[in-house]
Structures are given as C-alpha cells and as structure tokens.
Amino acid sequence: MAAQRKKRLSRTEKNNALLAQAAAVKVPSVADVVVVGGGASGLTAAISAAEALQDAKHPGTVVVFERALECGRTILATGGGRCNFANEDVRPENYRHPAFVRSVVGGKYLKEVLSFFRTCGLAWITEDEGRMYPVTREASSVRDVLLTRAKKAGVILACAREIVDIQTTSQ
C-alpha cells in the first residue's frame, strides 16, 4: 500500500490552527515576569528570566505576550531567511554612538551569545564579514531552538494577544 501524502494546509487553515492553539494556552492573571513581544529578544529575555528563577529555586511565572499568531515569526525574515544571529566582529567603533554600544554590548557580548546558543543546541557557521548563521542556513533553526528552550524553561507563550495595559504590584 502506497504511503499517503500529508495534505498541505492552506494559509487560512494554518492560521486557524495557530489561533486555536493560542486560545488553548492558559494565561495567568498574575505573573512574576511579563515580556511583551515574542521575537528573538523577547524569547531570549523570557528564557533568561525563567532560568534565573529556576536557578534561585524560586517558583515563578514568566509569560511572553505576542500579538502575532506564533512567537518567533520575525526571526524567519532575518538574514534573508537564514538568520544572521551574531557577528564575530562587533566593535563599538563600527557604530554611530560607540559609547552607547559599549555600555550595552560590553566586552563579553559574542562569548555570551555563542554560549547561550550552544546551550540551546544550535550549531553555526561563520561566513564572510564575520556573519554567523545556523549550519542549516535556515532561520527556522534559530526560532526552533529558542522556542524549545523557552518551553523547557516553563515560559508561557501567549500568542495572538495584544497588550493594552500592564499593572504592577509590589512585593
């Protein structure tokens, strides 16, 4: 018996499936850490927060709110769809405001970025001008390792939700 081909979903069917998946996520009304935006920076921030809570043996809730139907969609467009996730030649003097870049990036930027992605299980190559890409040359590889690590860390991914207001409480 010939193997059946898997039916490819239309864009509408895929979006409906993602919307149903997003609606099924239970979002707490109170969280220890809320990250608005589920792109690369938001996912990385949420992972770092969730793992810090775990390391401190402090049970906590980390939630990422993403307006789109799925987290990490913006990653897919970076680097021409290949995701240039780092550059081995990041020097503050290459930027318009080197002092600002130095204060944000610091001296350990590349080492920390590569350590983070190595821990995620991402393998990469370095191409011309120091651009670093996943060995698959597919941006989805970067998105997938970030989503996997976020879920492993217990991050709640609340997609298809737009934030209008956040209230803070002191503890």
Model-derived features: where do they sit?
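A short, basic/flexible loop-to-alpha-helix module at the beginning of a structural domain
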Residues: 2-3, 11-30
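Beta1/beta-strand and adjacent pyrophosphate-binding region of the FAD-binding site
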Residues: 25-41, 63
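Glycine-rich FAD pyrophosphate-binding loop
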Residues: 34, 50-80
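Small-residue (primarily alanine) positions within well-ordered alpha-helices
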Residues: 41, 45-50
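General beta-strand structural signal in soluble alpha/beta enzymes
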Residues: 66, 126, 157-159
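Glycine-rich active-site loop/strand segments that organize a redox cofactor
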Residues: 79-129
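Short beta-strand to alpha-helix junction loop
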Residues: 101-109, 129-148, 158
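A conserved short coil-to-beta-strand element within the FAD-binding core of flavoproteins
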Residues: 159-170
